């Protein structure tokens, strides 16, 4: 039985482009600048006391091979690095400003709780009076199930009344909340992230008060089990501690998850405030909202004081203002001068405190930062981002629940650490994904210098019936986050899709209608915060949005070829994006299984094997995608340790390859976010690179290395080559800092498998701030390198600034000798001729002298059958568009792509071909397109397979989850009729020694 995988189904959404507004991005041209080859070691085995030996020693002394650290050493550095960061940022967490006078509060922690019954619907007084069966719970309280339900919270309390007003405040309740005080309905609210309150002074009494809270949940607009709801919720939340339903993929439950209290206030009090900094003019505009309960117009005195919050400075500001005030909300603006302000940024998050007082009685405080974040909408391509007028590139990851749980659990030390875990791996921003969160999270990001993108909780679509409610909640979102210098950007919707391709267009907004909604939301946001940078869409599946920065999501090393093939991304192509605009990539990544220690400690026993050697498949883990998706990336494994190893190995590789590929396109990609950083629960979102126990997976460290702000990077489309080939490797400088660098030297050293230097190359160069540029090519002539069959070589580069090495990179490849005893082949068809002419394993011959017949065209089948009957020569069938569905010798052969995505990797049957590595048939070079291209796009469908040399796994369709072992589908096979293959050979033979050698070994084995 197959289960539904919603997120895999969404990933299969095809991006339909309004082409007239879109443009494809070609790779950045690499200049024809060659590194100078300065040293060549001719015979590495004969270097005793001659000059070559001295050269080797000199190279080794200055440029020792940059060995990869062990995971254990990286883990040790991680813990030490976090402690250093805690010490570094401790001063910014220490308050130096005076406190405002706090209002008196009565906080409610303990409630009786139960789900609504039929009796409650018939007689609501039963709830108000506390009849029925209740359980005791403690706030915060978030729970399941998902879907439609109603619950009640009830508590009784005494209260001391005086001449002040009494406001009941809810900091966070999900989703539709109704509040009753002493049987009076006093307050309603729809949503989950925004605080709401009401004056209940008239309904309170000294003794025996009863507070009842009705919380109603709904199905989200994404739907559940074929039903659609109206809940404005995306796919990110708090979850709950239940391994079956609560851990995984942020299920949309509900409940009162934040503080509830009654607060005493003056009849005239400060309701809200926001500071809009203007660093260009060294001023700050303070917006103050004052509420007045009195029914008459009167005078109010507003006192404002500003001083440094977390640093020592002589700056102090005090001001007294007389204003008229009416009943209700009154909005005032005050401009103050802050000369030579300390600017807020990622490294020095300086904050100020403003205290606002009304009539010398009520006080309100708020921290703010003097910073400017803006987007260039004047110069093409639009979309360059700036922090404090310096260009900036946003490098980060997605957050889905773990920070929110820190606040719920009152664990602020963990909250600090989670933000610093991001900083340690060179992130400068969090995408707090698909929902606004508790204010404490933004406050700590303010103090720790972590920039944040805040998302409105929409995913895929917006129901027409919720058009205006969603607009209202967008305003709430901006009011919720606008005070925080860390929040630099907002977005409205995640992965919108073309509603005309669904059966819900009568329910949901079309793309054009959604654009209208965006325009309204833009105006709402600008009303609340004129300086807000807006990115309307995250991961646009119905592009483009007509204003602002575009965004795409890319999972092409997990959901195969999602957005664009990995070979294209690696080469430098981008998906088609909005004309004249830069873009962002707000999600990319792969799943990596949790560490074994975490599994043993937290997983249910039924998910795990009895011992580490027992046969085990990860389909036991609820909602895990590894068993469904791994087949295009690595072998199916037998035991839990190997599954974890290969899963994490692939995740680490993908994190590095994709991050660096996106960084190389900083000319257009100004923002990137890995999906995800830290898990909120065991196996919650296994695309995370740090487990819920805060122990990193290997991918965390490759991600960290790929995000080094000033980095040297090697790029080459070939992983293998022959002796006598000339290999050009691109060298890039990726500079995410705003600093220009001159006086730079890059030294490249070619090493053999023993890390002895073979050749040395040099280039003098420079680097511009916030630019990624290819500075040149390292041309490796392999003709003078001795090889015995296969030689592992490494090209290492050392980037120096003013004589000091500041970064290194390594590119590994294999060099092969052409040691084939060439097989005579008679070719039938153009592709067959091309294979014979370009593959060093074959040579052309006539049909009488040939060892084998190679056929690639259906029109030659009769000739092949005649040869088979007359001289019984073996035949190699290359299935392609000219030879796809055919009969031969009473057997039918079809070329099928059913449940096989175009694969960059195909497993080799190592029991039949034991001399090959598991990943030898991956990331093959295509000389026709000059990039990495598919290994195979089809498998062979036939009724008889004797030997299967290369295969692919049958994969579930997107939206399904595979259970049990997967069927193997032949890609290179043999039976009595001959050898059959769907390997892509055009452009691959002659330039990929492994695929040449596999063909040779299979054919030679039958001769």
Report residues per predicted region:
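Short alpha-beta junction capping motif
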Residues: 849-893, 975-977, 1005
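Active-site-adjacent substrate/metal-binding segments within catalytic domains
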Residues: 141-156, 164-169, 174-182, 187-190, ...
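Catalytic beta-strand/loop cores that center a nucleophilic Ser/Cys/Thr
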Residues: 528, 901-997
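Active-site region of glycoside hydrolase catalytic domains
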Residues: 271-275, 285, 475-612, 668
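Beta-strand-rich binding/interaction modules
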Residues: 181, 283-323, 726-766, 773-779, ...
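Substrate-binding clefts and catalytic carboxylate motifs of secreted carbohydrate-active enzymes
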Residues: 2-119, 252-255, 490, 523-526, ...
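Accessory beta-strand-rich segments of carbohydrate-active enzymes
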Residues: 2-87, 94-97, 113-116, 148-269, ...
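Extended acidic/polar, glycine-enriched regions
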Residues: 205-208, 291-378, 787-819
């Amino acid at each position: 039985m197959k289960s539904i995988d919603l997120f895999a189904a969404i990933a299969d959404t095809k991006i339909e482009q309004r082409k007239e507004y879109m443009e494809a991005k070609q790779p950045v041209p690499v200049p024809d600048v060659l590194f100078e080859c300065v040293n060549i070691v001719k015979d590495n085995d004969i270097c005793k006391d001659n000059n070559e030996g001295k050269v080797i020693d000199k190279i080794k002394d200055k440029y020792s091979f940059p060995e990869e650290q062990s995971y254990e050493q990286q883990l040790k550095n991680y813990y030490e690095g976090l402690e250093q960061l805690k010490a570094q940022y401790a001063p910014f967490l220490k308050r130096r400003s005076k406190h405002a006078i706090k209002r008196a509060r009565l906080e409610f922690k303990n409630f009786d709780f139960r789900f609504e019954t039929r009796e409650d619907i018939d007689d609501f007084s039963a709830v108000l009076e506390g009849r029925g069966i209740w359980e005791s719970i403690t706030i915060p309280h978030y729970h399941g199930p998902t879907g439609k339900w109603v619950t009640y919270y009830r508590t009784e309390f005494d209260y001391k009344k005086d001449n002040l007003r009494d406001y009941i405040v809810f900091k966070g309740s999900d989703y539709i909340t109704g509040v009753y005080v002493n049987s009076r309905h006093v307050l309603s609210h729809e949503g989950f992230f925004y605080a709401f309150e009401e004056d209940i002074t008239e309904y309170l009494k000294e003794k025996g008060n009863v507070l009842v809270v009705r919380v109603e949940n709904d199905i989200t607009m994404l739907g559940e089990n074929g039903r659609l709801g109206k809940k404005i919720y995306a796919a990110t939340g708090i979850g709950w501690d239940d391994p079956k339903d609560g851990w995984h993929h942020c299920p949309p439950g509900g409940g009162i998850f934040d503080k509830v209290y009654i607060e005493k206030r003056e009849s005239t009090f400060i309701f809200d405030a926001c500071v809009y900094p203007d660093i260009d003019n060294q001023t700050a505009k303070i917006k103050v909202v004052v509420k007045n309960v009195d029914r008459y117009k009167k005078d109010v005195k507003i006192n404002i004081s500003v001083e440094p919050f977390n640093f020592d400075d002589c700056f102090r500001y005090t001001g007294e203002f007389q204003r008229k005030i009416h009943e209700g909300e009154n909005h005032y603006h005050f401009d103050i001068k802050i000369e030579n302000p300390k600017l807020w940024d990622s490294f020095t998050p300086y904050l100020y405190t403003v205290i606002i007082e009304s009539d010398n009685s009520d006080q309100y405080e708020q921290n703010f930062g003097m910073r400017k974040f803006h987007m260039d909408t004047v110069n093409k391509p639009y979309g360059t981002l700036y922090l404090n007028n310096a260009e900036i590139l946003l490098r980060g990851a997605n957050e889905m629940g773990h920070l929110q749980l820190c606040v719920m659990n009152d664990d602020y030390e963990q909250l600090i650490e989670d933000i610093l875990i991001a900083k340690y791996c060179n992130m400068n921003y969090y995408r707090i994904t698909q929902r606004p969160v508790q204010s404490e999270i933004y406050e700590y990001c303010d103090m720790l210098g972590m920039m944040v993108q805040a998302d409105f909780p929409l995913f895929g679509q917006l129901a027409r019936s919720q058009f205006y409610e969603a607009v209202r909640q967008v305003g709430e979102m901006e009011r919720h986050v606008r005070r925080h210098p860390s929040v630099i950007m907002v977005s409205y919707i995640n992965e919108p899709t073309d509603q005309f391709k669904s059966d819900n267009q009568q329910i949901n907004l079309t793309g054009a209608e959604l654009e209208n909604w965006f325009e309204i939301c833009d105006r709402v946001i600008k009303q609340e915060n004129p300086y807000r940078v807006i990115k309307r869409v995250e991961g646009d599946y119905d592009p483009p949005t007509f204003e602002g920065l575009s965004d795409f999501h890319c999972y092409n090393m997990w959901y195969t070829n999602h957005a664009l093939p990995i070979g294209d991304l690696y080469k430098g192509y981008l998906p088609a994006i909005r004309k004249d605009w830069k873009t962002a990539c707000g999600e990319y990544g792969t799943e990596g299984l949790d560490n074994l220690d975490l599994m043993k400690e937290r997983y249910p026993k039924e998910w795990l094997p009895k011992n580490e050697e027992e046969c085990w498949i990860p389909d036991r883990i609820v909602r895990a995608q590894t068993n469904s998706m791994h087949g295009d990336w690595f072998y199916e494994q037998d035991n839990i340790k190997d599954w974890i190893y290969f899963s994490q190995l692939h995740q680490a590789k993908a994190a590095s390859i994709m991050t660096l590929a996106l960084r190389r396109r900083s000319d257009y990609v100004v923002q990137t976010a890995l999906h995800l950083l830290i898990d909120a629960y065991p196996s919650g979102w296994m695309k995370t690179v740090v487990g819920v126990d805060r122990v990193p997976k290997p991918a965390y460290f490759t991600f960290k290395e790929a995000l080094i702000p000033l980095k040297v990077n090697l790029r080459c489309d070939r992983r293998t080559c022959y002796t006598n080939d000339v290999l050009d490797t691109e060298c890039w400088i990726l500079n995410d800092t705003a600093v220009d660098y001159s006086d730079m030297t890059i030294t490249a050293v070619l090493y053999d498998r023993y890390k002895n230097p073979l050749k040395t190359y040099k280039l003098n160069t420079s680097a511009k701030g916030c630019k990624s540029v290819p500075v040149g090519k390292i041309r490796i002539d392999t003709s003078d390198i001795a090889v015995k069959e296969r030689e592992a070589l490494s090209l290492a580069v050392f980037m120096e600034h003013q004589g000091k090495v500041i970064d290194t990179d390594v590119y590994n490849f294999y060099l092969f000798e052409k040691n084939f005893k060439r097989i005579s082949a008679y070719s039938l068809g153009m592709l067959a001729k091309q294979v014979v002419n370009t593959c060093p394993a074959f040579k052309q011959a006539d049909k009488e002298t040939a060892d084998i017949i190679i056929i690639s065209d259906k029109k030659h089948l009769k000739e092949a059958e005649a040869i088979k009957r007359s001289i019984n020569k073996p035949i190699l069938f290359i299935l392609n568009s000219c030879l796809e569905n055919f009969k031969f010798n009473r057997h039918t052969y079809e070329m099928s792509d059913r449940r096989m995505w175009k694969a960059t990797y195909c497993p080799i049957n190592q029991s039949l071909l034991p001399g090959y590595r598991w990943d030898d048939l991956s990331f093959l070079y295509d000389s026709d397109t000059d990039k990495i291209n598919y290994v195979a796009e089809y498998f062979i469908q036939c009724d008889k397979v004797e030997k299967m040399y290369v295969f692919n796994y049958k994969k579930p369709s997107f939206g399904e989850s595979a259970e049990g072992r997967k069927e193997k589908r032949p890609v290179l096979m043999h039976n009595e009729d001959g050898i059959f293959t769907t390997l892509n050979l055009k452009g691959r033979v002659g330039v990929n020694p492994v695929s040449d050698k596999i063909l040779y070994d299979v054919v030679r084995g039958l001769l």
